[in-house]
């Protein structure tokens, strides 16, 4: 039998299909202005016995499709535990929220903290800052690694930070140096979340921002040890949902 998990995120939708608890298919698309239409396209031709949804759009998905839902916290804990069984702390930074999750020795959630009230420290923040500097998201992390000076960014508010970036550019500061400062400000915020949930190694980094090489390098410095990133860090929630769909049916 095949089971599926779908993560309806603010920016992207991920689908994972399992057979005998092995990943047989991964699909991804943009959420767009109509995430349910996008989800329908993503599911076209996919065979499964049951599907479980997670992410911010999970309850809407449940209204349109025969499914059940699971919180992102639970889904990420299960997905990360499947990929790296020894993981004890998870950091997820997505398009519009970020979360830190502490697990016990059995992989159960014991504490978590979530920022979903503003864009500060999220993928949306980085996207806006990258645009302000004339970079796309892929360039933003790569170019920041080439910086020669670390510039302090005083505000994490997206509106004020964008204004600050504009001022720094007008003052003649190098774009790479500004990019490094912005990436570091995100890591500083994330490290604070990790510490508040009682940071314990090993640490697993998930979500779209985990593809940013500069963020990963700075996070390892902040944690003081290696962090683990899966080759497709955005599919962890969908994987967890698929595993739970199989477990509960």
Regions found by a protein language model. Name each.
Residues 19, 25-31, 43-74, 101, ...:
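Short beta-strand-loop/turn "lid" adjacent to the catalytic site in phosphate-handling enzymes
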Residues 57, 194, 199-222, 234:
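Glycine-rich phosphate-binding loops at beta-strand->alpha-helix junctions
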Residues 71-132, 229:
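Glycine-rich phosphate-binding loop of actin/hexokinase-like ATP-binding domains
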Residues 123-127, 230-249:
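Glycine-rich phosphate-binding/hydrolytic loop that grips phosphoryl groups
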Residues 161-195, 234:
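Adenine-nucleotide phosphate-binding core of ATP-dependent small-molecule kinases
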């Amino acid at each position: 039998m095949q089971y599926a998990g779908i993560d309806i995120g603010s920016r992207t939708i991920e689908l994972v299909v399992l057979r005998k608890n092995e990943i047989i298919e991964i699909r991804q698309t943009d959420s767009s202005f109509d995430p349910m239409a996008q989800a329908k396209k993503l599911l076209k031709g996919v065979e499964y016995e049951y599907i479980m949804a997670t992410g911010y759009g999970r309850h809407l998905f449940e209204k349109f499709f025969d499914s059940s839902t699971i919180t992102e916290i639970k889904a990420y804990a299960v997905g990360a535990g499947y990929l790296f069984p020894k993981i004890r702390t998870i950091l997820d930074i997505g398009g519009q929220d970020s979360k830190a999750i502490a697990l016990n020795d059995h992989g159960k959630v014991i504490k978590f903290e979530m920022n979903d009230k503003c864009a500060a420290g999220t993928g949306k923040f980085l996207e806006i800052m990258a645009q302000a500097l004339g970079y796309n998201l892929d360039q933003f992390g790569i170019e920041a690694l080439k910086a020669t000076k670390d510039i302090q960014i005083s505000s994490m508010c997206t509106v004020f930070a964008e204004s600050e970036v504009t001022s720094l550019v007008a003052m003649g500061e190098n774009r790479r140096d500004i990019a490094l400062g912005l990436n570091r400000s995100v890591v500083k915020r994330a490290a604070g979340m990790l510490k508040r949930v009682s940071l314990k190694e090993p640490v697993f980094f998930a979500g779209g921002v985990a593809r940013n090489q500069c963020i990963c390098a700075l996070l390892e410095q902040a944690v003081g040890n290696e962090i683990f990133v899966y080759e497709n860090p955005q599919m962890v929630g969908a994987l967890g949902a698929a595993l739970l769909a199989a477990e509960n049916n």
